[in-house]
Regions:
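Short amphipathic alpha-helical segments and helix-helix/interface helices
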Residues: 7-15, 35, 57-58, 132-136
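Catalytic binding pocket for nucleotide-activated donors in carbohydrate/polymer assembly enzymes
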Residues: 49, 55-125
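Donor nucleotide-activated moiety binding/catalytic core segment of transferases
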Residues: 21-73
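Hydrophobic "lid"/C-terminal helical patch
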Residues: 103, 107, 134-139
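Non-catalytic membrane-proximal stalk/linker segments that position and tether the catalytic domains
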Residues: 119-138
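Conserved catalytic-core segment of nucleotide-activated headgroup transferases in glycan assembly
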Residues: 1-31
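A structural signal for well-ordered alpha-helical scaffolds and beta->alpha junctions
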Residues: 3-7, 96, 128, 132
Length: 142
């Protein structure tokens, strides 16, 4: 569950710096709407708790979004969410300006940051390819 107070404070901070930035919650959307939203985004933020590797950040990074997460659950480790530690935050009031500044930088200087997701993207693509191979091995499909 996302920390609504933290998200509110982030939105408030961002609105004082750049009124053109839109926050689009990914909820109650069809698969196509999710795809279209992420494909058009420069940044995906997820301040929820990660019980394990999560689908949404994986889809976002696959569609070349920059990523910022909380440090809750498996997002804290570099195995499930392999992005720079500087892009993972404790959701404290003190971190609102830090998160806000990084968000602005990632949006305004998108090209400078998008390569930070290369390792994560490769991991996602490898998992997709190896999944098919594992299924073939399980069922002895040649």
């Amino acid at each position: 569950k996302i920390d609504q107070k933290f998200l509110y404070n982030i939105k408030k901070y961002i609105s004082t710096k750049n009124k053109d930035i839109k926050f689009i919650p990914i909820q109650n959307m069809s698969r196509k709407q999710v795809f279209d939203t992420l494909r058009g985004a420069k940044l995906y933020i997820d301040f929820g708790t990660f019980p394990g590797p999560e689908r949404m950040p994986r889809e976002a990074v696959s569609l070349y979004c920059n990523i910022i997460t909380s440090k809750k659950g498996s997002a804290a480790n570099n195995v499930d969410v392999p992005i720079p530690r500087e892009n993972k935050f404790d959701l404290t009031d003190e971190n609102v300006p830090k998160v806000g500044q990084l968000m602005l930088q990632m949006i305004e200087n998108y090209e400078d940051y998008v390569s930070q997701g290369d390792q994560y993207r490769e991991k996602v693509y490898d998992q997709i390819e190896s999944f098919d191979q594992r299924i073939a091995n399980i069922f002895d499909i040649k």
